[in-house]
Amino acid sequence: MYDVAIIGAGVIGSAIARELSRYQANVCVIEREEDVCDGTSKANSAIIHAGFDAAPGSLKAKLNVRGNEMMDALSKDLDIPFKRNGSLVVCTKDQDRSGLDALLEKGEKNGVPGLRILEREELLQMEPNLSDDVTCGLYAPTGGIVCPFHMTMAFAENAYTNGVSFFLNTKVTSIRKKDGSYTLETIHTDTDTPETFEAKVIINAAGVHADEFNNMVSEHKLHITARKGEYCLLDKEAGTHVSHTIFQLPSKMGKGVLVTPTVHGNLLVGPTAVDVTNKEAVNTTQDGLDSLAKTAALSVKNVPMRQVITSFAGLRAHEDGNDFIIGEAEDAKGFINAAGIESPGLSSAPAIGEMVAGIAADLLFLTKK
């Protein structure tokens, strides 16, 4: 029997596994895909957010700011490509700049350092390719960019090196509560071979499918909507078109279309935000890609879209409550959710790992190695 079984080997599950590998515990990670980082974690904006957008007091706010703070040491210790290039949220002449004032106020309440609102003249010194309609912007120097593949792989490899077992191509089909433990029935996705796992604690880090596992064991039902985001990746020749991550004023659907350099020297434009019923729908659409070019031009002019080298789409796990769901299910002792992890999930991942591992350690009275 395992002390802890983690469902999902994305950046969240892998971060939790790494933190748990510091304890005297028998831990496994169960992943239905053929490798780690094969779901939401592989198709996102690759941004380490500063933390000014989340509602003060929310888990998103607390964990975003903490995760951001952890990135310098993590990137050094685990050799994760990471750069603090800073971010700008720009306001155009058709928008009310009070939206920037609100972001500034939220950011200051969340403890984000160095925030300030800049006028157009100063913005153009930083980013000459801003659109002619941009009037002002919020500057966040602690914003950064990262490689989500390297980040997830680094967490997983470090966890594995320190004793965590990984079971890939293994799909969880059912979870049953027992006295003091859980039984997980799984099937190998290549061979259809069934396998049973038993664990004292289950950690649900299953992305867009996290509600399904919660609802197997708890009467407190979750509902997660898959929100599809499409992206265009441009050639490295376009990589210097902007140097900061350029955001638009956020809406209820997200942070708008961003234009950002990547840590590998490309330029990334995206995402769209469309709710879908199919939780496997990672296809791109012509309408979606066309809208990216049009919407990106509102904040950055002359984006060289003819230099697009690939496009892709990913799914965000949006929960109806608009916050991360982290903690033990009230009516399922030993079942810990890390669910509804949408933006700023990548930024928050190190802190989520820290928090969830701490919850599991307290439940099991684990001691550090």
Model regions and ranges:
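Glycine-rich FAD pyrophosphate-binding loop
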Residues: 22-42
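Flavin-dependent oxidoreductases
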Residues: 15, 175-180, 184-285, 294, ...
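Helical element adjacent to the flavin cofactor pocket in flavoenzyme catalytic cores
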Residues: 138-200
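Conserved Rossmann-like nucleotide-cofactor binding loop
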Residues: 12, 35, 209
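Dinucleotide-binding Rossmann-like beta1-alpha1 core, especially the glycine-rich loop
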Residues: 46-126, 256-257
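C-terminal catalytic lobe of FAD-dependent flavoproteins
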Residues: 254, 263-264, 280-369
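Short beta-strand to alpha-helix junction loop
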Residues: 55, 62-65, 90-99, 138-157, ...
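N-terminal Rossmann-like FAD-binding beta1-loop-alpha1 element of flavoenzymes
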Residues: 2-29
